[in-house]
Regions:
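Compact nucleic-acid interaction/catalytic patches
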Residues: 6, 13-52
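C-terminal terminal-subdomain/extension
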Residues: 49-101
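Mixed-charge, Lys/Arg-rich low-complexity intrinsically disordered regions
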Residues: 1-5
Length: 101
């Protein structure tokens, strides 16, 4: 079985998601979902992109709570948050999460 690790990026509904907390016993994973869509409703633009070669990245204003089946099986390599954007990510991670169906 795959193991989802805290602090890594995985696919969440076709978008990169940064795992904030992982509880394997209860099968609950909390993630902040990012993307590059210009539709800025319910999203905040990051100061620096998370991918090389992309002009701008966005992050959803609420984290998502899901089970292991909601996340992709492979870690997304090469993605990272800039240290200037981490306070925003930590603030979003404390908000009430949306549950994935």
């Amino acid at each position: 079985m795959k193991r989802i690790k805290k602090g890594k990026f995985y696919v969440v509904k076709r978008h990169p998601g940064f795992i904030i907390s992982a509880d394997e016993q209860k099968n609950k994973y909390l993630a902040v979902v990012t993307g590059t869509s210009k539709d800025t409703r319910h999203k905040t633009q990051l100061n620096h992109p998370i991918e090389p070669g992309v002009k701008e990245s966005y992050v959803k204003n609420r984290p998502v709570l899901g089970k292991k089946k909601h996340f992709g099986s492979h870690e997304l390599v090469g993605l990272r948050f800039h240290p200037d954007d981490m306070p925003l990510v930590e603030e979003i991670s404390r908000r009430k999460p949306q549950k994935l169906k």
